């Protein structure tokens, strides 16, 4: 049987024009859906509502944003997606201290 990755949605990243727009969007989302702005996940690049909606403080990867996925076997999942015609940006790779790939776009 063919390998199928066990993808899990980690978060949805939404590109905003700037920090002010990210704050406004996060606030509106909080009002609409009762998902509080999450200061624990705040960074120089993004603001979160809850744990799964990331409001980018400047345009990031993708035209509108990105979907962050996790999988137990990243190398196998990468091969699976490449076989389906998807490509990756080698310059985007971030590694764990032991050399394993942590993130790739």
Language model features by range: what are they?
Residues 1-24, 62-69:
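N-terminal beta-strand motif that seeds the catalytic metal site of vicinal oxygen chelate
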Residues 1-7, 38, 49-57, 79-105:
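Vicinal oxygen chelate
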Residues 52, 60-63, 72-76:
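Short, charged/polar surface micro-motifs in flexible loops or helix N-caps
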Residues 19-34, 76-85:
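Amphipathic alpha-helical segments
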Residues 12-14, 33, 37:
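Compositionally biased, intrinsically disordered low-complexity regions enriched
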